[in-house]
Amino acid sequence: LEEDIHEIDFNTRIAQAVESQNFREAIRLHYLKNLKILSDQNLIDWKINKTNHDYEVEIRDNSIKAPFSRITYLYDNICYGDFPIDSESYSRFVEDFEVFDKV
């Protein structure tokens, strides 16, 4: 993670990634967007050098921790585990990420 999540136009970048069928990048951006949402709500203390596990430990509310653990699992497997992702699987997985839009 090299970019400051507070300076990214997520909606535009996600739309561009989906339009170019770069679903792995779209998932990465959804994950970063969720980190920003959690940071903005003071549920995590975002720092560029923290790990996903660090954020999981910080989240105390189980109603947020459980879905965060799920998207972290998806993110890790899709972005680092080379889990194959096409438009159909993206459509299924994106619902898990969009839960945080309502936090």
Task: Write out the residue ranges for each language-model feature.
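Charged alpha-helical initiation segments
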Residues: 1-15
